[in-house]
Amino acid sequence: MNEKKKDSLSVLDSNEFFGETTMVSPSIDVSSSPRPNVERFSPCSTKKDLLEGNNIMTRIPEELSRVSLQFDSKGSQQSMIFTNNRCLSDKENLENLQNLLYLHCDLNRPHLSCELPSEHREKCLKRRNSSLSSNLHANKRFLFNSQSDGNKKNETFPSTNYSNVFYPNNCDSKEVASETTFSLDAPNNSVNYSYFSPNLLGNDSKTRQSFPPHSSSSSHNSLHEPVIYDFSSENPSIHPSNHLSSQKNAVLKLAQLISSFEKLPESVRQYLLFHLLSRCGKHAVQNIHKILLPIFQKNFLTGFPAEITNLVLTHLDAPSLCAVSQVSHHWYKLVSSNEELWKSLFLKDGFFWDSIDSKIRTMCLEQSLSACAIMKRVYFRHFNLRERWLHAPEKIKRCSFPIHGVRLITKLQFDDDKIIVSTCSPRINIYDTKTGVLIRSLEEHEGDVWTFEYVGDTLVTGSTDRTVRVWDLRTGECKQVFYGHTSTIRCIKIVQGNQSTTDTDDVEKENRPASNDANSMPPYIISSSRDCTIRLWSLPCLDDPPFVNVNENPDQNNDFTSATTNPFYIRTLRGHTDSVREVACLGDLIVSASYDGTLRVWKASTGVCLHVLRGHVGRVYSVTINPSRQQCISAGTDAKIRIWNLESGELLQTLHGHSNLVSQVTFNQNILVSASAPPDTSLRVWDLNTGSCRDILKCPLGHIFFQHDESKVVSGSHSTLQLWDIRSGKLVRDLLTDLDIIWQVAYNENVCVAAVLRNNRFWIEVLEFGSTKSS
């Protein structure tokens, strides 16, 4: 035997009818592949020990046991020959070849020598001087099978790590004339073998077959095409047979392609990958996407402590949190089960708890919803309201209807069903909010109606006829008439006592009015008049029988006669020396603003004047209360806004900025807004923490009336109804234009109503920003 290169596997055909054939393994790097455990065998190891599995390794994959692989050396050319198994399909043969080349390559390992059938053992041993040498090793990657039928055997012998060598199944039916020997050539680490096909014994000519041989019983007698790998150079070349498919040829090039790809520059790699992907089918690209997607997904939130995760989430706005919740189930739980997160976002966005939120909370508790679900629902109510107003479509649903026979509109109040308007006349008109149809007119007063307020179906009105009247809005019937004032009634308020709940939620407590012993007073009516007095009346129930006043002469209705003749009369608050323009109330506290330049703080349950607030120069036109801080805020003709402590009566702060009469000041949701008459003509938004003016909403023609909440201001000037973003101070849009004057403005969650003068006629304009159901 010629000496071969070290660590190569050589197989020598020893049959006298064959020429010498040497099979040489390709140079495959297997340094990273796990080595099988190898045990040394004695030359005297019996065939029984091998066949019974003593010191023999486990089974190789079944698909590899059906693969035919042959190595050949002709002259200086070294090659590897792969022969198709005709019992398998082309696809299965291709998969086997891929497995051989890339999965189980372990060619440079010693292999096992086995005994041959007794008839041929002696002949073969004579021709193998080095057979069964002391250096024989067993590769435990292979399984040996033996089936006994008399003295004849079907035996499976190991070959390289790629396949098994075995006798055909029909060996038992004929005289066994095949010889297969395996010997280990120690110096060259090579194995020699020979094999005769039994189905060719009848011929003098012997045909060399690659292993494993095919059964003679097979109906496929066609030769299978070999694929030759050329390993004669450092870069192996491929010599495909004329009948080899292009797919197998491409598979054999993969090793070289992969090796070359790793050496390419990054830009060339990207170029090559682009063209490869563009030539892939849809399913292949989907599988690649599944592999790549987890690489670029970083679930960093799961690696943080809960405190850090919450801190990260608190820096996101509502749309971002909604996007986060859609990333995964885990992130959805982080967002949807964190009550503190939604509370923080609620306050950060400048929202405030109101009575509707309390109703939502009660409804959710009845449905057994979690605290987080309640807070989330309340937040999105406020968020959607703001978005609906500030980002409304260009065309808003609008309804206009005229008001006939009036000279002036003194007050407007509405809900989703009705709009109530008082005019400078004894008449009070009630319209349908959706259609503008006049529902009814109330005409019991004998003088002009200047003020009113309603709660539910109870309407209370004040007039220049110096009476307070209580109406049933369901029927339009006047239920009660209260006498006592001696001049025009300028202001009416209905106080229903302390309506705060027992809930301890921090968000609610931030905006809830203080108690002030309101439970000691039943629901009552406040009426203030130009007669310098404030009168308190119990709020009648609509089912109470009408009170008949025995003495309708107002001059004779003093405190004594009212107390004895009117069961609804409570008391009169005296102290002001001029007309009481406006009153504000908080539970048991009443704050009155007068033209005498003072404000007075009263205790309603006792009638005691707690404080006289002096500081304004001139008339006080407007007053409002900050319930969370126990403060009242006033403004008047001196163009100053003053902030007072209700408990001590101390002047806390004076806000400067307006240059003319401040006709209106309102406090809502922790935001203070004031309006000044011409030539100032500005709305100012104030920061109560610093006393500075946060924004100036300038209108050339001045603001006559306005209303605001946590997100917006709706103001009416002489010719335009405008919508402002209170957070930025910017004008969002003009809601109405080309008007003569705007007298009154009011809005709720979904609807804005304005009383305007256009072309010398009075109109009610209704603008709809959403439905009640959407709220």
Curated annotation (Swiss-Prot):
Top-level taxon of origin: Eukaryota
Q: PROSITE patterns in the record, alphabetically? A: FBOX (PS50181), WD_REPEATS_1 (PS00678), WD_REPEATS_2 (PS50082), WD_REPEATS_REGION (PS50294)
WD repeat locations: 444-472, 484-538, 575-603, 615-645, 657-687
A Gene Ontology molecular function term of the record: microtubule plus-end binding
Q: Supply the SMART domains for this chain.
A: FBOX, WD40
Answer yes or no on keyword Phosphoprotein: no
Question: Domain named F-box: which ranges?
Answer: 298-345
Against Pfam families, the record matches this protein to: F-box-like (PF12937), WD40 (PF00400)
Q: Which SUPFAM superfamilies match?
A: F-box domain, WD40 repeat-like
**Cellular localisation:** Nucleus
Q: Does the keyword Cell membrane apply?
A: no
One of the GO BP terms on file:
conjugation with cellular fusion
Main localization is nucleus
GO CC terms, sorted: cytoplasmic microtubule; kinetochore; microtubule associated complex; nuclear envelope; nuclear SCF ubiquitin ligase complex; nucleus
Q: Which UniProt keywords apply?
A: Nucleus, Repeat, Ubl conjugation pathway, WD repeat
Alphabetized PANTHER family for the sequence: F-BOX AND WD REPEAT DOMAIN CONTAINING 7 (PTHR19848:SF8), WD40 REPEAT PROTEIN (PTHR19848)
As for what it does, the entry says: Involved in maintenance of ploidy through proteasome dependent degradation of CDK inhibitor rum1 and S-phase initiator cdc18. Functions as a recognition factor for rum1 and cdc18, which are subsequently ubiquitinated and targeted to the 26S proteasome for degradation. Together with pop2, required for cig2 instability during G2 and M phase and cig2 degradation in exponentially growing cells. Regulates cell-cycle progression under starvation through the rum1 protein.
Assembly and partners are described as: Homodimer and heterodimer with pop2. Binds to cdc18, phosphorylated cig2, cul1, pip1 and skp1.
Q: What is this protein called?
A: WD repeat-containing protein pop1
The scientific name of the source species is Schizosaccharomyces pombe (strain 972 / ATCC 24843) (Fission yeast)
Name of the encoding gene: pop1
